Protein backbone atom coordinates (compact mmCIF):
# COMPACT_ATOMS: atom_id res chain seq x y z
CA UNK A 1 0.00 0.00 0.00
CA UNK A 2 1.50 3.33 -1.06
CA UNK A 3 1.73 6.36 1.24
CA UNK A 4 1.27 9.33 -1.12
CA UNK A 5 -2.16 10.47 -2.36
CA UNK A 6 -3.84 13.58 -3.67
CA UNK A 7 -6.95 13.15 -1.53
CA UNK A 8 -8.36 10.65 0.95
CA UNK A 9 -12.08 9.86 0.92
CA UNK A 10 -13.59 8.44 4.11
CA UNK A 11 -17.02 7.15 3.15
CA UNK A 12 -19.42 4.80 4.94
CA UNK A 13 -20.95 3.09 1.91
CA UNK A 14 -21.00 2.92 -1.86
CA UNK A 15 -24.33 4.77 -1.87
CA UNK A 16 -22.65 7.72 -0.15
CA UNK A 17 -19.64 7.47 -2.46
CA UNK A 18 -21.91 7.77 -5.50
CA UNK A 19 -22.90 11.20 -4.19
CA UNK A 20 -19.28 12.42 -4.30
CA UNK A 21 -17.73 10.29 -7.05
CA UNK A 22 -17.27 13.27 -9.41
CA UNK A 23 -14.54 14.54 -7.09
CA UNK A 24 -12.67 11.22 -7.09
CA UNK A 25 -9.42 10.59 -9.02
CA UNK A 26 -9.01 6.84 -9.45
CA UNK A 27 -5.25 7.10 -10.03
CA UNK A 28 -4.25 9.35 -7.18
CA UNK A 29 -6.83 9.16 -4.39
CA UNK A 30 -7.40 6.72 -1.51
CA UNK A 31 -10.82 5.52 -0.38
CA UNK A 32 -11.40 4.26 3.18
CA UNK A 33 -14.71 2.56 3.95
CA UNK A 34 -16.54 -0.01 6.06
CA UNK A 35 -18.47 -1.31 3.07
CA UNK A 36 -17.57 -4.41 1.02
CA UNK A 37 -19.55 -3.03 -1.95
CA UNK A 38 -17.54 0.19 -2.09
CA UNK A 39 -14.23 -1.60 -1.63
CA UNK A 40 -14.98 -3.98 -4.49
CA UNK A 41 -16.24 -1.14 -6.70
CA UNK A 42 -13.04 0.89 -6.29
CA UNK A 43 -10.85 -2.21 -6.72
CA UNK A 44 -12.65 -3.01 -9.97
CA UNK A 45 -11.91 0.56 -11.13
CA UNK A 46 -8.24 -0.03 -10.36
CA UNK A 47 -8.23 2.47 -7.50
CA UNK A 48 -6.69 2.48 -4.04
CA UNK A 49 -9.06 1.35 -1.31
CA UNK A 50 -8.87 -0.16 2.18
CA UNK A 51 -11.25 -1.00 4.97
CA UNK A 52 -11.26 1.90 7.40
CA UNK A 53 -11.32 -0.43 10.41
CA UNK A 54 -8.63 -2.78 9.11
CA UNK A 55 -5.53 -0.70 8.39
CA UNK A 56 -3.18 -1.85 11.14
CA UNK A 57 -0.78 -4.79 11.17
CA UNK A 58 -2.24 -7.96 12.76
CA UNK A 59 0.56 -8.41 15.30
CA UNK A 60 0.31 -4.77 16.36
CA UNK A 61 -3.43 -5.13 16.89
CA UNK A 62 -2.90 -8.32 18.88
CA UNK A 63 -0.41 -6.52 21.11
CA UNK A 64 -3.06 -3.90 21.76
CA UNK A 65 -5.69 -6.56 22.41
CA UNK A 66 -3.73 -7.54 25.51
CA UNK A 67 -3.38 -3.91 26.60
CA UNK A 68 -7.05 -2.99 26.24
CA UNK A 69 -8.24 -6.12 28.04
CA UNK A 70 -5.93 -5.42 30.97
CA UNK A 71 -7.66 -2.04 31.25
CA UNK A 72 -11.05 -3.70 30.71
CA UNK A 73 -10.36 -5.81 33.80
CA UNK A 74 -9.09 -2.96 35.98
CA UNK A 75 -10.96 0.25 35.05
CA UNK A 76 -13.47 0.23 37.96
CA UNK A 77 -10.84 -0.14 40.71
CA UNK A 78 -9.28 2.79 42.57
CA UNK A 79 -5.58 3.17 43.37
CA UNK A 80 -5.94 0.84 46.38
CA UNK A 81 -7.63 -1.91 44.36
CA UNK A 82 -11.11 -1.25 45.73
CA UNK A 83 -14.13 -1.32 43.43
CA UNK A 84 -15.39 2.25 43.01
CA UNK A 85 -18.88 0.91 42.34
CA UNK A 86 -19.93 -0.66 45.64
CA UNK A 87 -23.46 -0.78 47.05
CA UNK A 88 -24.33 -2.25 50.46
CA UNK A 89 -20.78 -3.66 50.57
CA UNK A 90 -21.25 -5.53 47.26
CA UNK A 91 -18.72 -4.52 44.56
CA UNK A 92 -20.43 -4.43 41.16
CA UNK A 93 -18.20 -2.54 38.71
CA UNK A 94 -17.65 -5.82 36.89
CA UNK A 95 -21.32 -5.85 35.84
CA UNK A 96 -20.92 -2.92 33.43
CA UNK A 97 -18.88 -4.82 30.85
CA UNK A 98 -21.60 -5.45 28.31
CA UNK A 99 -22.80 -1.84 28.53
CA UNK A 100 -19.70 -0.39 26.88
CA UNK A 101 -17.68 -3.36 25.57
CA UNK A 102 -18.40 -2.78 21.87
CA UNK A 103 -17.95 1.01 22.07
CA UNK A 104 -14.66 0.58 23.91
CA UNK A 105 -13.11 -1.84 21.40
CA UNK A 106 -14.59 -0.03 18.38
CA UNK A 107 -13.11 3.30 19.48
CA UNK A 108 -9.68 1.73 19.92
CA UNK A 109 -9.86 0.00 16.54
CA UNK A 110 -10.83 3.20 14.70
CA UNK A 111 -8.31 5.27 16.68
CA UNK A 112 -5.43 3.01 15.66
CA UNK A 113 -6.64 2.86 12.06
CA UNK A 114 -7.06 6.62 11.67
CA UNK A 115 -3.69 7.25 13.25
CA UNK A 116 -2.22 5.53 10.18
CA UNK A 117 -3.48 8.47 8.11
CA UNK A 118 -1.06 10.81 9.88
CA UNK A 119 1.76 8.84 8.24
CA UNK A 120 0.35 9.38 4.73
CA UNK A 121 1.07 12.32 2.45
CA UNK A 122 -2.10 13.96 1.06
CA UNK A 123 -3.72 17.30 0.25
CA UNK A 124 -7.24 16.93 1.64
CA UNK A 125 -9.52 14.48 3.42
CA UNK A 126 -13.15 14.37 2.31
CA UNK A 127 -15.69 12.70 4.59
CA UNK A 128 -19.25 11.53 4.04
CA UNK A 129 -20.10 9.49 7.12
CA UNK A 130 -22.72 9.13 9.83
CA UNK A 131 -20.04 7.93 12.25
CA UNK A 132 -19.32 10.87 14.58
CA UNK A 133 -16.40 9.00 16.06
CA UNK A 134 -14.36 9.55 12.88
CA UNK A 135 -14.57 13.34 13.23
CA UNK A 136 -13.83 13.16 16.94
CA UNK A 137 -10.67 11.12 16.46
CA UNK A 138 -9.38 13.17 13.52
CA UNK A 139 -9.83 16.28 15.68
CA UNK A 140 -7.76 14.57 18.37
CA UNK A 141 -4.93 14.16 15.85
CA UNK A 142 -5.45 17.74 14.61
CA UNK A 143 -5.96 16.38 11.09
CA UNK A 144 -7.97 18.78 8.93
CA UNK A 145 -10.83 17.48 6.80
CA UNK A 146 -13.72 18.61 4.63
CA UNK A 147 -17.26 17.32 5.12
CA UNK A 148 -19.73 16.44 2.38
CA UNK A 149 -23.23 17.31 3.51
CA UNK A 150 -25.30 16.59 0.41
CA UNK A 151 -26.98 13.20 0.86
CA UNK A 152 -30.10 14.13 -1.08
CA UNK A 153 -29.38 11.66 -3.88
CA UNK A 154 -28.96 8.75 -1.46
CA UNK A 155 -32.09 6.60 -1.25
CA UNK A 156 -30.70 3.57 0.58
CA UNK A 157 -27.45 3.79 2.55
CA UNK A 158 -27.35 0.13 3.54
CA UNK A 159 -23.94 -1.39 2.86
CA UNK A 160 -22.45 -4.84 3.07
CA UNK A 161 -21.06 -4.79 6.58
CA UNK A 162 -22.41 -5.70 9.99
CA UNK A 163 -24.34 -2.85 11.70
CA UNK A 164 -23.00 -3.66 15.15
CA UNK A 165 -24.42 -0.58 16.91
CA UNK A 166 -27.91 -1.31 15.57
CA UNK A 167 -27.71 -4.95 16.62
CA UNK A 168 -26.42 -4.22 20.13
CA UNK A 169 -29.05 -1.58 20.73
CA UNK A 170 -31.75 -4.08 19.78
CA UNK A 171 -30.35 -6.68 22.19
CA UNK A 172 -29.14 -4.83 25.27
CA UNK A 173 -30.83 -1.43 24.83
CA UNK A 174 -34.18 -2.36 23.27
CA UNK A 175 -36.76 0.30 22.45
CA UNK A 176 -40.18 0.38 20.80
CA UNK A 177 -42.23 -2.80 20.72
CA UNK A 178 -39.26 -4.97 21.66
CA UNK A 179 -38.61 -2.74 24.65
CA UNK A 180 -42.28 -3.02 25.62
CA UNK A 181 -42.07 -6.84 25.51
CA UNK A 182 -38.96 -6.80 27.70
CA UNK A 183 -40.68 -4.60 30.28
CA UNK A 184 -43.78 -6.80 30.24
CA UNK A 185 -41.65 -9.88 30.83
CA UNK A 186 -39.90 -8.15 33.73
CA UNK A 187 -43.25 -7.32 35.36
CA UNK A 188 -44.52 -10.88 34.97
CA UNK A 189 -41.29 -12.27 36.43
CA UNK A 190 -41.46 -9.83 39.36
CA UNK A 191 -45.06 -10.70 40.26
CA UNK A 192 -44.48 -14.46 39.94
CA UNK A 193 -41.21 -14.21 41.85
CA UNK A 194 -42.91 -12.35 44.69
CA UNK A 195 -45.95 -14.62 44.99
CA UNK A 196 -44.44 -18.10 44.72
CA UNK A 197 -42.32 -18.13 47.90
CA UNK A 198 -45.55 -17.66 49.90
CA UNK A 199 -47.36 -20.33 47.88
CA UNK A 200 -44.45 -22.73 48.39
CA UNK A 201 -44.57 -22.30 52.16
CA UNK A 202 -48.19 -23.45 52.12
CA UNK A 203 -48.15 -26.23 49.55
CA UNK A 204 -44.59 -27.27 48.66
CA UNK A 205 -42.22 -29.17 50.94
CA UNK A 206 -38.82 -27.58 51.39
CA UNK A 207 -36.38 -28.69 48.72
CA UNK A 208 -32.91 -29.72 49.71
CA UNK A 209 -31.13 -27.47 47.22
CA UNK A 210 -31.89 -24.21 45.45
CA UNK A 211 -29.86 -23.63 42.30
CA UNK A 212 -29.90 -20.46 40.22
CA UNK A 213 -29.29 -21.24 36.54
CA UNK A 214 -28.51 -18.91 33.65
CA UNK A 215 -30.83 -20.10 30.90
CA UNK A 216 -29.06 -20.67 27.58
CA UNK A 217 -28.04 -23.46 25.23
CA UNK A 218 -25.41 -25.19 27.47
CA UNK A 219 -27.77 -25.26 30.47
CA UNK A 220 -31.09 -26.04 28.75
CA UNK A 221 -31.10 -29.76 29.56
CA UNK A 222 -29.63 -29.14 33.00
CA UNK A 223 -32.65 -26.97 33.80
CA UNK A 224 -34.94 -29.73 32.54
CA UNK A 225 -33.18 -32.31 34.72
CA UNK A 226 -33.24 -30.42 38.01
CA UNK A 227 -36.73 -29.04 37.40
CA UNK A 228 -38.01 -32.62 37.63
CA UNK A 229 -36.04 -33.44 40.79
CA UNK A 230 -38.06 -32.82 43.97
CA UNK A 231 -34.84 -32.21 45.88
CA UNK A 232 -34.23 -29.08 43.81
CA UNK A 233 -35.73 -25.65 43.39
CA UNK A 234 -34.68 -24.20 40.04
CA UNK A 235 -34.34 -20.43 40.25
CA UNK A 236 -34.19 -18.42 36.99
CA UNK A 237 -34.20 -14.81 35.84
CA UNK A 238 -37.24 -15.43 33.59
CA UNK A 239 -39.26 -18.49 32.62
CA UNK A 240 -37.10 -20.89 30.60
CA UNK A 241 -37.45 -20.51 26.87
CA UNK A 242 -39.23 -23.09 24.72
CA UNK A 243 -40.75 -24.85 27.75
CA UNK A 244 -44.44 -25.60 28.18
CA UNK A 245 -46.46 -23.77 30.81
CA UNK A 246 -46.67 -26.82 33.08
CA UNK A 247 -42.88 -27.03 33.25
CA UNK A 248 -42.55 -23.26 33.69
CA UNK A 249 -44.74 -23.49 36.79
CA UNK A 250 -42.08 -25.74 38.37
CA UNK A 251 -39.58 -22.89 38.05
CA UNK A 252 -39.04 -20.04 40.49
CA UNK A 253 -38.04 -16.54 39.40
CA UNK A 254 -36.03 -13.72 40.89
CA UNK A 255 -38.36 -10.86 41.88
CA UNK A 256 -36.55 -7.86 40.40
CA UNK A 257 -38.50 -4.63 40.87
CA UNK A 258 -39.03 -1.38 42.69
CA UNK A 259 -39.07 2.36 42.06
CA UNK A 260 -36.04 3.38 40.03
CA UNK A 261 -36.30 6.96 41.34
CA UNK A 262 -35.19 5.72 44.76
CA UNK A 263 -31.71 5.10 43.36
CA UNK A 264 -31.05 8.44 41.65
CA UNK A 265 -29.17 9.96 44.59
CA UNK A 266 -26.95 6.90 45.02
CA UNK A 267 -26.32 6.88 41.27
CA UNK A 268 -25.13 10.50 41.34
CA UNK A 269 -22.90 9.84 44.34
CA UNK A 270 -21.29 6.87 42.61
CA UNK A 271 -20.68 8.81 39.40
CA UNK A 272 -19.00 11.61 41.37
CA UNK A 273 -16.90 9.01 43.17
CA UNK A 274 -15.96 7.50 39.81
CA UNK A 275 -14.85 10.90 38.48
CA UNK A 276 -12.61 11.56 41.49
CA UNK A 277 -11.28 8.04 42.19
CA UNK A 278 -10.70 6.50 38.75
CA UNK A 279 -7.09 5.50 38.52
CA UNK A 280 -6.15 3.15 35.68
CA UNK A 281 -4.90 4.42 32.33
CA UNK A 282 -4.99 2.95 28.84
CA UNK A 283 -1.80 3.58 26.89
CA UNK A 284 -1.53 1.77 23.57
CA UNK A 285 1.57 0.08 22.20
CA UNK A 286 2.60 3.18 20.21
CA UNK A 287 2.42 5.35 23.34
CA UNK A 288 -0.99 6.87 22.59
CA UNK A 289 -2.91 7.64 25.78
CA UNK A 290 -6.64 7.19 25.12
CA UNK A 291 -7.65 7.05 28.78
CA UNK A 292 -9.85 10.14 28.84
CA UNK A 293 -11.71 9.19 25.65
CA UNK A 294 -12.40 5.69 26.98
CA UNK A 295 -13.56 6.98 30.36
CA UNK A 296 -15.93 9.33 28.50
CA UNK A 297 -17.35 6.32 26.63
CA UNK A 298 -17.72 4.37 29.87
CA UNK A 299 -19.40 7.23 31.73
CA UNK A 300 -21.76 7.91 28.83
CA UNK A 301 -22.87 4.28 28.67
CA UNK A 302 -23.11 3.49 32.38
CA UNK A 303 -24.78 6.75 33.48
CA UNK A 304 -28.10 6.05 31.79
CA UNK A 305 -28.37 2.54 33.20
CA UNK A 306 -26.81 2.93 36.64
CA UNK A 307 -30.10 3.45 38.49
CA UNK A 308 -31.47 0.25 36.96
CA UNK A 309 -28.28 -1.57 37.96
CA UNK A 310 -28.75 -0.41 41.54
CA UNK A 311 -32.42 -1.41 41.58
CA UNK A 312 -31.55 -4.89 40.29
CA UNK A 313 -28.63 -5.26 42.66
CA UNK A 314 -30.77 -4.22 45.62
CA UNK A 315 -33.46 -6.72 44.60
CA UNK A 316 -30.84 -9.48 44.48
CA UNK A 317 -29.49 -8.51 47.90
CA UNK A 318 -32.98 -8.48 49.42
CA UNK A 319 -33.80 -11.86 47.89
CA UNK A 320 -30.62 -13.50 49.18
CA UNK A 321 -31.10 -11.97 52.63
CA UNK A 322 -34.37 -13.91 52.91
CA UNK A 323 -33.85 -16.99 50.75
CA UNK A 324 -31.33 -19.81 50.54
CA UNK A 325 -29.36 -20.39 47.33
CA UNK A 326 -26.79 -23.18 47.23
CA UNK A 327 -25.20 -22.78 43.81
CA UNK A 328 -25.14 -20.46 40.79
CA UNK A 329 -24.77 -22.10 37.36
CA UNK A 330 -23.56 -19.72 34.64
CA UNK A 331 -22.71 -19.83 30.95
CA UNK A 332 -20.85 -16.49 30.86
CA UNK A 333 -19.73 -13.56 32.99
CA UNK A 334 -22.25 -11.39 31.14
CA UNK A 335 -25.90 -10.45 31.40
CA UNK A 336 -27.53 -7.68 33.42
CA UNK A 337 -29.41 -9.53 36.16
CA UNK A 338 -27.38 -12.74 36.09
CA UNK A 339 -24.07 -10.96 36.65
CA UNK A 340 -25.43 -8.82 39.47
CA UNK A 341 -27.00 -11.83 41.17
CA UNK A 342 -23.71 -13.72 40.87
CA UNK A 343 -21.80 -10.80 42.39
CA UNK A 344 -24.11 -10.80 45.42
CA UNK A 345 -23.66 -14.57 45.69
CA UNK A 346 -19.88 -14.13 45.59
CA UNK A 347 -20.15 -11.60 48.41
CA UNK A 348 -22.19 -14.13 50.40
CA UNK A 349 -19.69 -16.94 49.63
CA UNK A 350 -22.16 -18.92 47.49
CA UNK A 351 -20.22 -21.01 44.94
CA UNK A 352 -20.66 -20.81 41.18
CA UNK A 353 -20.22 -23.28 38.34
CA UNK A 354 -19.69 -21.94 34.82
CA UNK A 355 -20.14 -24.01 31.65
CA UNK A 356 -18.57 -22.06 28.81
CA UNK A 357 -20.90 -21.03 25.99
CA UNK A 358 -18.96 -22.13 22.93
CA UNK A 359 -15.26 -22.48 22.30
CA UNK A 360 -13.01 -19.83 23.86
CA UNK A 361 -10.06 -19.18 21.56
CA UNK A 362 -8.60 -15.71 22.25
CA UNK A 363 -6.01 -15.78 25.02
CA UNK A 364 -6.04 -12.03 25.68
CA UNK A 365 -9.58 -12.18 27.13
CA UNK A 366 -10.73 -13.11 30.62
CA UNK A 367 -14.38 -13.86 29.80
CA UNK A 368 -15.67 -16.92 31.73
CA UNK A 369 -12.72 -16.82 34.16
CA UNK A 370 -14.86 -15.68 37.08
CA UNK A 371 -16.46 -18.66 38.77
CA UNK A 372 -15.63 -21.05 41.59
CA UNK A 373 -15.62 -23.99 39.18
CA UNK A 374 -15.43 -23.89 35.38
CA UNK A 375 -16.18 -26.45 32.66
CA UNK A 376 -13.87 -25.75 29.71
CA UNK A 377 -15.30 -28.59 27.53
CA UNK A 378 -11.84 -29.83 26.53
CA UNK A 379 -8.27 -30.10 27.74
CA UNK A 380 -7.15 -27.91 24.83
CA UNK A 381 -9.28 -24.99 26.00
CA UNK A 382 -8.29 -25.66 29.61
CA UNK A 383 -4.58 -25.59 28.78
CA UNK A 384 -4.58 -22.72 26.28
CA UNK A 385 -7.36 -20.28 27.17
CA UNK A 386 -7.49 -20.98 30.91
CA UNK A 387 -3.73 -21.58 31.28
CA UNK A 388 -4.43 -24.85 33.10
CA UNK A 389 -5.67 -23.18 36.29
CA UNK A 390 -6.79 -25.58 39.01
CA UNK A 391 -10.50 -24.75 39.19
CA UNK A 392 -11.08 -25.63 35.51
CA UNK A 393 -12.39 -29.07 34.53
CA UNK A 394 -12.82 -30.57 31.05
CA UNK A 395 -16.33 -32.05 31.30
CA UNK A 396 -17.66 -31.65 27.76
CA UNK A 397 -20.50 -29.66 26.24
CA UNK A 398 -23.98 -31.06 27.07
CA UNK A 399 -25.21 -29.86 23.66
CA UNK A 400 -22.86 -32.23 21.87
CA UNK A 401 -24.63 -35.28 23.34
CA UNK A 402 -27.32 -34.88 20.69
CA UNK A 403 -24.84 -35.68 17.93
CA UNK A 404 -23.88 -39.03 19.45
CA UNK A 405 -27.47 -40.20 19.01
CA UNK A 406 -27.95 -39.18 15.38
CA UNK A 407 -27.15 -41.42 12.45
CA UNK A 408 -24.35 -40.08 10.30
CA UNK A 409 -25.19 -38.54 6.95
CA UNK A 410 -24.87 -40.50 3.73
CA UNK A 411 -22.62 -38.20 1.75
CA UNK A 412 -23.67 -37.45 -1.82
CA UNK A 413 -20.60 -36.58 -3.86
CA UNK A 414 -22.38 -36.53 -7.24
CA UNK A 415 -24.89 -33.76 -6.50
CA UNK A 416 -23.79 -32.54 -3.06
CA UNK A 417 -25.57 -30.03 -0.86
CA UNK A 418 -22.98 -27.54 0.27
CA UNK A 419 -23.79 -25.48 3.35
CA UNK A 420 -21.89 -22.30 4.11
CA UNK A 421 -22.02 -21.27 7.76
CA UNK A 422 -21.88 -17.49 7.51
CA UNK A 423 -18.99 -15.59 9.00
CA UNK A 424 -19.43 -12.75 11.45
CA UNK A 425 -17.80 -9.64 12.87
CA UNK A 426 -16.17 -10.15 16.26
CA UNK A 427 -16.79 -6.86 18.05
CA UNK A 428 -14.44 -7.79 20.90
CA UNK A 429 -11.27 -8.37 18.82
CA UNK A 430 -9.26 -5.48 17.36
CA UNK A 431 -8.25 -7.70 14.44
CA UNK A 432 -11.82 -8.16 13.25
CA UNK A 433 -13.57 -5.78 10.85
CA UNK A 434 -17.24 -5.15 10.14
CA UNK A 435 -17.22 -6.36 6.50
CA UNK A 436 -15.51 -9.70 7.19
CA UNK A 437 -18.66 -11.78 6.68
CA UNK A 438 -19.10 -10.44 3.15
CA UNK A 439 -15.40 -10.79 2.30
CA UNK A 440 -15.71 -14.40 3.44
CA UNK A 441 -18.89 -15.06 1.48
CA UNK A 442 -17.66 -13.45 -1.73
CA UNK A 443 -14.53 -15.62 -1.83
CA UNK A 444 -16.47 -18.84 -1.35
CA UNK A 445 -19.29 -18.03 -3.76
CA UNK A 446 -16.72 -16.90 -6.33
CA UNK A 447 -15.17 -20.36 -6.10
CA UNK A 448 -18.52 -22.05 -6.66
CA UNK A 449 -19.36 -19.69 -9.51
CA UNK A 450 -16.16 -20.84 -11.22
CA UNK A 451 -17.00 -24.47 -10.46
CA UNK A 452 -20.45 -24.05 -11.97
CA UNK A 453 -18.91 -22.61 -15.13
CA UNK A 454 -16.73 -25.73 -15.29
CA UNK A 455 -19.84 -27.91 -15.23
CA UNK A 456 -19.89 -28.96 -11.58
CA UNK A 457 -23.31 -29.63 -10.06
CA UNK A 458 -24.27 -28.84 -6.47
CA UNK A 459 -26.86 -27.20 -4.23
CA UNK A 460 -25.88 -24.22 -2.10
CA UNK A 461 -27.26 -23.21 1.30
CA UNK A 462 -26.16 -20.24 3.36
CA UNK A 463 -26.90 -20.57 7.08
CA UNK A 464 -27.11 -17.02 8.39
CA UNK A 465 -25.88 -16.49 11.94
CA UNK A 466 -28.47 -15.70 14.65
CA UNK A 467 -27.17 -12.12 14.75
CA UNK A 468 -27.06 -11.79 10.96
CA UNK A 469 -29.48 -9.98 8.68
CA UNK A 470 -30.91 -12.35 6.07
CA UNK A 471 -32.08 -9.54 3.77
CA UNK A 472 -28.49 -8.30 3.53
CA UNK A 473 -27.43 -11.74 2.32
CA UNK A 474 -30.21 -12.00 -0.22
CA UNK A 475 -29.33 -8.57 -1.61
CA UNK A 476 -25.63 -9.52 -1.73
CA UNK A 477 -26.39 -12.72 -3.68
CA UNK A 478 -28.64 -10.89 -6.13
CA UNK A 479 -25.99 -8.26 -6.77
CA UNK A 480 -22.91 -10.44 -7.18
CA UNK A 481 -23.99 -14.05 -7.76
CA UNK A 482 -27.32 -14.13 -9.55
CA UNK A 483 -25.89 -16.99 -11.64
CA UNK A 484 -26.03 -19.23 -8.57
CA UNK A 485 -29.17 -20.72 -7.06
CA UNK A 486 -28.72 -20.27 -3.32
CA UNK A 487 -31.05 -20.93 -0.40
CA UNK A 488 -30.62 -18.69 2.63
CA UNK A 489 -31.70 -20.00 6.04
CA UNK A 490 -31.75 -18.11 9.32
CA UNK A 491 -34.30 -19.54 11.76
CA UNK A 492 -34.08 -23.30 11.18
CA UNK A 493 -31.96 -25.03 13.89
CA UNK A 494 -28.41 -25.81 12.80
CA UNK A 495 -28.81 -29.53 13.35
CA UNK A 496 -31.69 -29.65 10.85
CA UNK A 497 -29.60 -27.82 8.26
CA UNK A 498 -26.66 -30.17 8.78
CA UNK A 499 -28.83 -33.26 8.35
CA UNK A 500 -29.22 -32.38 4.67
CA UNK A 501 -25.61 -31.26 4.17
CA UNK A 502 -22.84 -33.15 2.34
CA UNK A 503 -20.00 -30.61 2.56
CA UNK A 504 -19.74 -27.83 5.17
CA UNK A 505 -17.72 -24.61 5.05
CA UNK A 506 -17.55 -22.13 7.91
CA UNK A 507 -15.49 -19.78 10.05
CA UNK A 508 -13.85 -20.67 13.39
CA UNK A 509 -17.03 -22.18 14.76
CA UNK A 510 -18.23 -25.06 16.89
CA UNK A 511 -20.55 -25.92 14.00
CA UNK A 512 -17.55 -27.45 12.22
CA UNK A 513 -17.44 -30.05 15.00
CA UNK A 514 -21.19 -30.56 14.84
CA UNK A 515 -20.94 -31.23 11.11
CA UNK A 516 -17.99 -33.59 11.55
CA UNK A 517 -19.96 -35.57 14.15
CA UNK A 518 -22.49 -36.26 11.38
CA UNK A 519 -19.75 -37.54 9.08
CA UNK A 520 -19.70 -34.37 6.96
CA UNK A 521 -16.33 -33.28 5.51
CA UNK A 522 -15.63 -29.73 6.67
CA UNK A 523 -13.53 -26.73 5.69
CA UNK A 524 -12.50 -23.78 7.83
CA UNK A 525 -12.28 -20.87 5.38
CA UNK A 526 -9.96 -18.43 7.14
CA UNK A 527 -10.85 -14.98 5.88
CA UNK A 528 -10.68 -13.59 9.41
CA UNK A 529 -7.36 -12.17 10.62
CA UNK A 530 -7.82 -12.96 14.29
CA UNK A 531 -5.15 -14.90 16.17
CA UNK A 532 -6.86 -17.95 17.63
CA UNK A 533 -5.95 -21.22 19.33
CA UNK A 534 -6.05 -24.70 17.84
CA UNK A 535 -7.68 -26.06 15.78
CA UNK A 536 -8.22 -22.66 14.14
CA UNK A 537 -4.55 -21.67 13.93
CA UNK A 538 -3.91 -23.08 10.42
CA UNK A 539 -1.71 -25.73 12.02
CA UNK A 540 -4.03 -28.58 12.97
CA UNK A 541 -5.95 -31.53 11.57
CA UNK A 542 -8.74 -29.20 10.41
CA UNK A 543 -8.68 -28.50 6.66
CA UNK A 544 -8.03 -24.76 6.49
CA UNK A 545 -8.39 -22.76 3.28
CA UNK A 546 -7.09 -19.22 2.69
CA UNK A 547 -8.13 -18.28 -0.85
CA UNK A 548 -10.54 -18.95 -3.69
CA UNK A 549 -8.21 -21.15 -5.77
CA UNK A 550 -7.59 -23.44 -2.81
CA UNK A 551 -11.35 -23.53 -2.14
CA UNK A 552 -11.89 -24.84 -5.67
CA UNK A 553 -9.29 -27.55 -5.07
CA UNK A 554 -10.86 -28.39 -1.70
CA UNK A 555 -14.16 -29.05 -3.48
CA UNK A 556 -12.48 -31.33 -6.02
CA UNK A 557 -10.81 -33.17 -3.13
CA UNK A 558 -14.19 -33.58 -1.46
CA UNK A 559 -15.63 -35.01 -4.67
CA UNK A 560 -12.72 -37.45 -4.89
CA UNK A 561 -13.12 -38.49 -1.22
CA UNK A 562 -9.58 -37.28 -0.53
CA UNK A 563 -8.02 -38.42 2.75
CA UNK A 564 -7.24 -34.85 3.82
CA UNK A 565 -10.71 -34.70 5.44
CA UNK A 566 -10.42 -37.94 7.40
CA UNK A 567 -8.50 -36.72 10.45
CA UNK A 568 -11.11 -34.18 11.49
CA UNK A 569 -13.86 -36.77 11.09
CA UNK A 570 -12.15 -38.83 13.80
CA UNK A 571 -13.91 -38.37 17.15
CA UNK A 572 -10.66 -38.78 19.10
CA UNK A 573 -9.11 -35.91 17.17
CA UNK A 574 -12.17 -33.71 17.70
CA UNK A 575 -12.31 -34.54 21.41
CA UNK A 576 -8.94 -32.84 21.90
CA UNK A 577 -10.62 -29.54 21.11
CA UNK A 578 -14.34 -29.87 21.87
CA UNK A 579 -14.29 -32.38 24.72
CA UNK A 580 -16.07 -35.71 25.13
CA UNK A 581 -18.26 -36.98 22.28
CA UNK A 582 -19.50 -40.08 24.08
CA UNK A 583 -23.05 -38.86 24.70
CA UNK A 584 -22.50 -38.57 28.47
CA UNK A 585 -21.72 -34.86 28.84
CA UNK A 586 -25.06 -33.97 30.41
CA UNK A 587 -24.73 -36.58 33.15
CA UNK A 588 -21.05 -35.75 33.59
CA UNK A 589 -22.01 -32.13 34.32
CA UNK A 590 -24.95 -33.10 36.53
CA UNK A 591 -22.76 -35.47 38.56
CA UNK A 592 -20.24 -32.66 38.98
CA UNK A 593 -22.99 -30.32 40.22
CA UNK A 594 -24.10 -32.93 42.77
CA UNK A 595 -20.51 -33.21 43.99
CA UNK A 596 -20.28 -29.45 44.46
CA UNK A 597 -23.51 -29.39 46.44
CA UNK A 598 -22.53 -32.37 48.58
CA UNK A 599 -19.04 -30.91 49.07
CA UNK A 600 -17.48 -34.11 47.73
CA UNK A 601 -14.05 -34.43 46.18
CA UNK A 602 -14.03 -33.11 42.60
CA UNK A 603 -11.04 -35.10 41.40
Residue ranges and their predicted role:
Residues 1-603:
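Catalytic-core helical/loop segments in enzymes performing group transfer/polymerization on anionic/lipid-linked
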